[in-house]
Amino acid sequence: MKARSTIYWLLSFGILYFLGMLLPLMENDSAQFAVMASRMVIENDFTHLYKGSLPYLDKPHLHYWLAAISMKLFGIHAFSYRLPGVLLLFVGAYFVFKTTKLLYDERTAFFSGLVFIASQTIILAGFDLRTDAVLTGLVAWAIYHLARYIYDEKLNQLLWGALVAGFAFATKGLISIVVIGGVVLALLNAKQKWGLLFRVSTLGALLVFLFSLTPVLYAYFIQFDLHPELVVRGVSNRSGIKFLFWEQSFERLSGEGHGKTGNDPFFFFHTFLWAFMPFSLVGIVGLYKTFRSKFSEVLVLKNLTIALLLLLGLMSLAQFKLPHYLNVLLPLITLVFTPAVLRLVDQKIGKPLSIITFVIYGIASVLICIPFYDYAALGVFLGLVILSWMLHRRRVSMVSWLLSGVLVFNLLAFTVFYPKLLDYQSDISFSKRLNLQDAELVNAMHKHTWNLDFFFQTHLPERSIDELVDSHEIYVLVDIDTYQRLKLLRPDAVEYASALHYRVTKLSLKFLVPKTRSSTLEVRRVIWLP
């Protein structure tokens, strides 16, 4: 792939990411993390982390610090919350390009950065932004410097790699070091440079790594180690430092404190099939053909592939796992599969596979219009037919088929599907209609209200129904159960606003089908107590 065409595609995907950054935040995680970061700005407290009114001991501070700095510079809104994460995704794409150029060749390198930024899971990570966006970018960054050190043996590359690896650790803990370490071990084995591990410079790198963690260690010590009386997930006397270095990752492996999401040993393997779209199908076939022909001759690719399989297997052992946990492996996945994808460009099987992928995205593009704009589905279908005809007439490469499919689908997602879907987050609806200068709003549902907290830049006070019996001139947020109880105790309560609510991150077929959607919705209300 040529540099000029790569730039055009990157600009197209840059516009796509920008559109996603303008949308409201999704609950729970994105909105929750935005509230946690904005609280740092509002209270000018960058040391303590809180989830609502409770001390937060889960993911370390760096993601929240970056978001808070962005909000301090550009204001408290969804765009500024997403900005550091999206920028680091593009930084990650750049360092994937640099690493691929180091390991393979320039042609593969230009394509690799595009493969990374156009992967379906990375696009979603830039919109439904959690800690994984920052983590993935930093992991790609650290891998490049450490790979350069293995190839060139320059001390500055080792120290840069250790510093950035520390930042990755300060974002989500031990998993970052496991992934970075897996790549480093694979390259050490490929180049037979195991002696690098036993140099004095390795000790210096360890010191730099620990130095980069000092802000997080200090914050954890202040919030938790000095306050053993704090209770987190039912346990007191929690050490933040011990949690960071040991407990966090092993709690997820065992499911302790987080619950269990299933024992499917192939969870991340089948998650990969959609997460690495539009390149998963052609990548698997390409890697298979590489394996059949000269796999044993390509030592770097061989070792990276083994490292990827081992890391996937290790992550699959966890009792608590979610699809976006795969994101941290995307830099390595890109390094493994980009040469395999390019291998098919000049082969007969490559273009049919890319057209099949385009058709899959085309069908998905039509389907996401149906739930909210069924009349537009026909127009989208006709547009895709015309686009297919144009691509066929111009005899474009398989790469253009792949990138066109993912670009069209996600443009429709960010301009058609998600804007309507997010209307079913009642907090967003209420935030447009309430004026808290008139009176206080309290939460009687005992459910999180992250988007309202973010919009009004405060944690809504929680009140029980019994506490509200004698309250006056106050707004109360209720669901159907608390509404009925409140009306019995306060017949004078007046409905101020109502909105339909759905947990939009857990889509179901019943919700997506317009005729059955009403059965999946709950009604939430804002009540005025005179």
Predicted regions and their residues:
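Membrane-interface transmembrane helices that cradle and orient dolichyl/undecaprenyl
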Residues: 101-107, 142-160, 168, 341-345
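Membrane-embedded architecture of ER/inner-membrane glycosylation machinery
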Residues: 159, 253, 289-530
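Transmembrane-helix signature of polytopic, membrane-embedded enzymes
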Residues: 3-9, 96-118
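Transmembrane-lumen/periplasm boundary regions of multi-pass, lipid-linked membrane glycan transferases
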Residues: 176-298, 307-339, 353-372
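Specific aromatic-rich, kink-prone transmembrane helix
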Residues: 95, 135-151, 333-336
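Transmembrane-helix motifs of polytopic, lipid-linked glycan transferases
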Residues: 83-103, 141
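Short acidic/glycine- and proline-prone juxtamembrane loop motifs at membrane-interface regions
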Residues: 121-135
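Extracytosolic helix-loop segments that constitute the early lumenal/periplasmic catalytic or substrate-binding loops
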Residues: 14-16, 32-55, 62-65, 69, ...
